[in-house]
């Protein structure tokens, strides 16, 4: 009897530890919403995407510096007409952050039902928007829209932000959109953000086909970026765009 009890406890423990959690394969939680973030280089078959009921929102690239994504406007119209929540992001570059913010909003528009986001790709100030410029950009978006944008960053950028700014920084007012292409996040830096809002967990870096991908959305291909929301589908739908 004792052996059987021990075996049962071991099986139960293994099942428990295999369950998805906030920092472990969150995309396996079937109650969690999935968000796509395409750009003009991605192909989308919307009729096929509709087969995945967990996909409820799209955050599309709108601008990069002073360039516009060619498919942004047509895809926004199509996605919203098919019931998807919509958001946009600006990929920040070196240069005047106020002019970049204004250009971004001239394309994305000021809409009460859409999410805004700033993409800080890396910590190299010669190729990506420096952090001091990002602060100005964020404040400009808030000034114009009354809402803070999501901040998209990877581990290196998040750690750089944590090292260079304090807890009262404007960054702490922005939801975190965290890029990390692994099954677990054992080293999340919680100085500025206590949690992520979106976890970008899949891209061409770790998804090369239907059989070799953390999560496959029909109607997309391996290089389509996919994100999981740190909450349920219903919570995302209720809170959007204030996620």
Regions flagged by a language model, labelled:
Residues 75-79, 99-100, 126-133, 155-162, ...:
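Noncatalytic linker/hinge segments flanking ATPase motor cores
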